[in-house]
Amino acid sequence: MAETTNTPETSHRKELIGLVVSTKMQKTIVVQVERQKSHAMYGRVISRRKRFYAHDEEQTAHIGDYVRIEETRPLSKLKRWKLAEVLRRSALAPEVQEAAS
């Protein structure tokens, strides 16, 4: 009889790292993800940006934070991502961010 080992369940969901650019909605953040790709004909490296709406249940992320988001089921018309963790906090103080909002 073959012996089976219990391996930890790995997530097959996509993950992205980006910058929080807006926290004006309740429990929702807007994350800007930048990627670089090579131009097909000329070979020059081009930066491309895309914005994703992500669910932030505890409202822990602030503008300027670098966060990791992961794919999830559709939560609304635009939200298909959720906040996994805050990687690096912004240099701005939370009081300044609240005044800017």
Swiss-Prot record:
UniProt GO molecular function: rRNA binding; structural constituent of ribosome
Secretion signal, residue range per the UniProt entry: none
SUPFAM superfamilies on file: Nucleic acid-binding proteins (SSF50249)
GO biological process, one term: translation
Keyword hit for Secreted: no
Key words of the record: Ribonucleoprotein, Ribosomal protein, RNA-binding, rRNA-binding
Gene Ontology terms: cellular component: cytosolic small ribosomal subunit
Short name of any one Pfam family annotated for the protein: Ribosomal_S17
Taxonomic superkingdom: Bacteria
Gene3D superfamilies linked to this entry: Nucleic acid-binding proteins
Protein's UniProt keywords contain Ribosomal protein: yes
Segments passing through the bilayer: none
Function: One of the primary rRNA binding proteins, it binds specifically to the 5'-end of 16S ribosomal RNA.
Family: Belongs to the universal ribosomal protein uS17 family.
UniProt-listed PANTHER family: 40S RIBOSOMAL PROTEIN S11 FAMILY MEMBER, SMALL RIBOSOMAL SUBUNIT PROTEIN US17M
Quaternary assembly: Part of the 30S ribosomal subunit.
This protein's name: Small ribosomal subunit protein uS17
Native organism: Koribacter versatilis (strain Ellin345)
